[in-house]
Amino acid sequence: MAQGRERDEGPHSAGGASLSVRWVQGFPKQNVHFVNDNTICYPCGNYVIFINIETKKKTVLQCSNGIVGVMATNIPCEVVAFSDRKLKPLIYVYSFPGLTRRTKLKGNILLDYTLLSFSYCGTYLASYSSLPEFELALWNWESSIILCKKSQPGMDVNQMSFNPMNWRQLCLSSPSTVSVWTIERSNQEHCFRARSVKLPLEDGSFFNETDVVFPQSLPKDLIYGPVLPLSAIAGLVGKEAETFRPKDDLYPLLHPTMHCWTPTSDLYIGCEEGHLLMINGDTLQVTVLNKIEEESPLDRRNFISPVTLVYQKEGVLASGIDGFVYSFIIKDRSYMIEDFLEIERPVEHMTFSPNYTVLLIQTDKGSVYIYTFGKEPTLNKVLDACDGKFQAIDFITPGTQYFMTLTYSGEICVWWLEDCACVSKIYLNTLATVLACCPSSLSAAVGTEDGSVYFISVYDKESPQVVHKAFLSESSVQHVVYDQQGIFLLVGTAEGKVFIINANSSSSFQIIGFTEVAKDILQISTVSLLETDIVEVMVLSSLPEAGRSRLEMFTLPTLLPQVSTTFADERGRLKDEIIHKYLYELEHALSSAVLGFQSNQIYGFCSQVPYICSYLLPEEEHTGIYILKPYKKVQSRQYGPGLLYLSSHGLWLITIAKCGILCIRDVYTLETFAWCRSHSHQGHGIQSMRISMDGQNILVNGRDDGTLVYLKWKRFGGHLASEILDYYQKLLISLSSAMDKENHYLSTTPKVSVDLGSDSEHTKQKASTDLSQDELVLTDVKKEIPWIQQKSQEAIKKEVNLFSKKRKEIKQGIKSLSKTILNMMEENDKLENIAKLDQQEFGLDLEELERLHDESQEEVAKMIKDVEMHNLAKSYLAELIKEECWNSMAVKGRALKCFHIPCVVENFPMKARTVEELKELERVLQQKKIEAECLKLRKEIVEAQSGVKLIKQRHEEDDEEEEEEDKTVKYSNLPNYLLGSLSTDFGVDTSLLSSQLELHSREEKINQIILLKDIIYKVKTVFNNEFDAAYKQKEFEIARVKERNVRIREIILDLELEEAVWQPEFEDCEKPERTLVVQDEEITAHKHIKPWHKAKELIVNHEKEHWLLIQDASTRLRALMDMMGGVLEVKKEDILRMVIPQPAFMAKPDAVWTEEERKQFKDYEKKVKELNEERDKYRKSLEAELKKLQNSIQESTQAFDEHLKRLFERRVKAEMVTNQEELKISNLAFSLLLDEELSSREKFLNNYLTRKQHEKSQTSEAVRKSREDLDVCKEHYDNLLAEDKVMDRSFKKEFSEIPGHQVDILYKLFKRRPRISKQKTHSETTSVVPFGELPGSGKLNKDAFAQLMKAMDELDNISNMPEGLDPLVWNHFCMTRRAKVENEQKVKQKAADLLEMATFLQKRVEEEEKVQQEIERVFHELILLQEEKVRFQLNLTIQILLKQGQVELENFQLVLEYSDAILINKNIIEDLNSVIRTQGQKKVASMMESKDVHKRILQIEWEHKKMEMEREDLNQKAWDIQMLFFSRDRQKYLNEPNYEALISIQIGIMEQTIAVLDKMHKKNVENCKKLLKKLGKFSNQKDIANYALSCNLREELVAVSERKDICNAMGSKLTCEKIVKERYENMMQQQKLTNISKQQAEQISILQTEVERLRMKTFPALVQM
């Protein structure tokens, strides 16, 4: 086992003893990697665990800075890299198998690395970090430097891999994107180039994307202006405009899940939607592979999306969530799926070994399988993961060979302590919480969430079994603790009960009783010494409200199991006075506390402050709560809440905390003598620990990192070991008899039938639970009752038996009450529905009745609240509508109807103009007035300059001036057809409106809109005034009709006609305020009348009746009513109702009448006749009056209807004017909007141009730098090549002193090179490995060079020396040859670097050209946009009024093409035609009148010809006399009306040109200065080099002279002279050519200057923008 060499020196001073990590058990949460063909590794907590798949041997590497982050391995170099999780994390690179640190990489990442990946060949490591940098970095991990990095904010990546065949390609994929990054290198410079893959749509089809920046397919609109891209319409001008797409244009794409590379540098991508994609690595072209469906599809499985992919020959291996591995056989563009392997769990990761003979399969639980090709068995489980992290651990007594672990799902494992091999497993199939092993027997207790305790027998380690189950309560078990001698088992539950159970299996784990403590139990501590017969128990609980902790202590005698009935009551509760229960409180909160073995001392770990305190218990007894004060306080030097444990002999205090450090302290001094950092604070430290009885074995369990660490002592001896070993021996001797007895009982105890499961059954059950979690298995089992409820029921039974008589009496009373209630229910059934009570009212359950009553009250209150809220919402909505549509209206909307015809006229509802609108209108009006005054002043100034004409005009007659003024006014007011509306018909002033042909600027259009809105407001106001007048007139007419109807009703009543009286009324549309008032008849609900209202109505009715009685008693009034109908004077209207009473004698026959009576009868008839005549006369007068009144009503109402019809026409015209003005406003608003879009587009193009220019400067700088580097490298290459040639040519000169034949032999040996034997790979391996031999890299080149040097050592051996050669000469020859070989290698390497740099330069040049093309394209787009903008500003949209039926077009094509069409008024054409016709008629008449017209014409033509000839003669004479030269400037001066403005413009252009030339000149001067400075430095360098060369030249001349003497002496001619002569001739020729090129360059520069001067002279106004 090896650990990291760097470990933080903690703040603890360890003494002579120290701890070390023996092994670590944990299961992978990240992907498992191969280090070599036989070793895999994975991170777990603070460690990296290496496993040999053949021997299953583990090796551990510990991270010095906490939890291991991400990890990657490099198989060729056998190194592993991982990051830590601290702030500003580091990357560590370790070699394997030595586990020595190679390097430490430090970047600028703030939080965490998320991905690491090694290149398959070379020393490159790629790292990726997410938030907040989103940075991809490339490292040279051997030299610990970052080669290049790039940040892309917002891009989250979940997989990263290098191309196995090309280290320059890197693929990054996420659920939404796939990108291929290319690494480009030039000498020592590296850079990233990213390209994104265009993914298909979800259905596998491809979407044709258009260019967002420069769209080419936009339609052309000749009427409404240019059509711009969507980004310009949206107003985007930044980078977001380059990728902007509206929501309607966004389509869901495929979601990649995994990718893998192929030997052809292609990519296979698996998607969530089930598609398999193939991407070309060079072109990034995406191909959707077609799936070939089999005839018999796979049953009971539905493979949707691959979770992981690995490449194999002719296809890929993929896995999903169904636990199967599939083989994808790919041919061309289709693939077929076949079953490859079945795994018990869903597969999360797969990878091949480097030799491709082993396939590693990792499940979601963390288990690791190895599939070996061509061997039996093919599938082998390397790592069997547990079902979740370890919840609890404990040693099996005595703690030297085995230990147990428990997971939350109920999985119990027995492990071999030496190498952590799993011996056996058992599943409880329930949620477990705690575990404890019994010191006095081979058994263990497991607490569960449902309140049960399972007792496990581990007598047979390979097959543990449940021997007993105790269902204590329905509250979960949180603590299970054995005392030191294994007498009692104490179980703490969440509800605050501590159960005491007999720990002996022979007693069937008898439950003795329980005691109640505080609910939040933190720890239970016991002390059971060998020399005493009691067990002291302490329970620690927290009081979060008070910020304190409570200690509750009680004593249990060892004889308690025999006398348990006397210690507990009938319900099982232990009596506090018998167990001597005492309460203590501490003034501060503790996270843990243990009871010391001696001196009644307690040790506590403070949770708020980093201190460990000891407390002394009082010796005297006390009642109530006793406050403990700290006796000793020591700083723990551990942060976070911690736990305390005591060793078996009670002299070691072991502390663990959130920081992950375990400390062993002396119990007396509380000082640390041993410590170990086994976990880290990133994983929330240590959850629990266990120490064996002999103190030599320590198990530490992490809280969140899922690691179990086994610690051993490095040095364990002396007094430290003797104390605990002595106590261990005594304890074993004391427990030996009890252990033998209990173990024998456990060996004979049968297994309890509890629903347990084996490994395979548990796996299947787990899988079925995962697949369908909603299925419920119903079993007909009787519900089990907890022990505490059983005791309660037994106590209740005893109480029932004790009070049986009283119970009978109560039963009889209940029976009588039930009979009474039954009678009441029968009576209730006979009542009516209103009087009936509900069935629940007769229930005797008062609590139920109260509950139902409360529910009904709550329901009523809820309904009331809902109704109130509903009413409130409706009221609020009504108030909003009223405020918006009524109160805010300055002019309320209303209608006006005619009396007789169906005609309705509505007014214009209008809101009051705001203060801002009025201020804006005032500003525009003031501006218009100022402009008018300015225009008037300008006209006066221009007229004053004209001089004489102005004086003549002032002296003209007054009539002509008035006519001209009228004409001017008439001209200034535009006609309606040019104004575009009929607003002048309403008397609205339109003189301030600008002409529609002059609205070019944005401000003019805005001002025009404001004025048009004001015109609309005025038009509406004018009409509303007319409407109000008509409304008042109708009110007057209705009042007058109502007044006349009074008389009409009287006449009808007098005439006793049945004719109805027509009474006009205002309708609701005419008086809309009625809608806001709710009438009583509109309310459909029953009106609720309050009691005091009812009482008031009764009083009013009583007073009315009393008044009527008083009126009946008045005889005078009654007499008046009987005599004259209640009136004192007879009116004329009463004639019609007047009746003359008949005499009384008329009842007699005529024969018996007397004369007097006959005379009275005649008088009667005369009166009747007169009355009838008067009645007829009055009736006729009434009828005439009635007809007259009705006619007057008819006439007045019809007159009003006619007026309203005219008002309706006025309303139509006003609406027409309003629509016309609003149409103009809409056109202006559209032009403003289009202007904004054009401005946005122009800003975006300018910003885009700025970015491209910046990019161009960067690319130009990169090209310049690359070209300089290439030149330097080429120079070095030329030097090396020249040195190589010199070494080759000067070989014979070096060995000129030896004979010629030996020189020839040595030259052949000098040219000879060793053959390097390539390692031949086996044919089987070559056929299996799909990637074959990976391409070379820098490391491989170094290895090849080292191998070449090794082979050169063999050639340099003395045995290869030719015969007769001096050994000194041989050694000199070997050194020369080795130098030649090294130089050749340098030349090859430099040639490769040169080719790479040339390629890099070519790419940079291509990028520069591409950017330049983009810039030119942007310039072209800007020019087109500016042209469009100018065209849009000039081509105005105007509104012209046309008369219907007067537009005639013979050619319909004129409507389509507006290039030559002019729209004019028809009246102008007609007037012109009439004038032409009149003049033509006059001309014909004059020609007919004059007979000699033709002669006169001929005469005039002759005279005209004569005069022309004379003019020619005179002109010729004038030309002969004087020739006058007239230049173009003078012509321009005479022809140009504003020559000074033209001159000023040209001066401005020339100034700009001069400024630009000055700027360019300064820039050229600066460049020349820089060049001169650079040349000066270069000259100094050359002087120094020339001085060095001159010195060398002297030495060489001396050597040459010596050699000449030698050669002359030997009589042989040297070839050096020939070489020197040739070099001299070449040098002279080169110098001559250099001079010629300089002269030509000077001539070219002079010609360029002349060309530039001529160009500026020809085009002086072309200034660069």
Curated annotation (Swiss-Prot):
Q: Which SUPFAM superfamilies match?
A: WD40 repeat-like
Question: What does the entry state regarding organ or tissue expression?
Answer: Testis-specific.
Q: Does the keyword Transferase apply?
A: no
* Superkingdom of origin: Eukaryota
What broad class describes the main subcellular location of this protein?
other
Keywords (A to Z) from UniProt: Cell projection, Cilium, Cilium biogenesis/degradation, Coiled coil, Cytoplasm, Cytoskeleton, Disease variant, Flagellum, Repeat, WD repeat
Keyword Transcription regulation attributed: no
| Function description | Flagellar protein involved in sperm flagellum axoneme organization and function. Involved in the regulation of the beating frequency of motile cilia on the epithelial cells of the respiratory tract.
Quote the disease note of the record: Spermatogenic failure 19: An infertility disorder caused by spermatogenesis defects and characterized by abnormally shaped spermatozoa in the semen of affected individuals. SPGF19 patients have spermatozoa with absent, short, coiled, bent, and/or irregular-caliber flagella, which impair sperm motility.
Q: What is this protein called?
A: Cilia- and flagella-associated protein 43
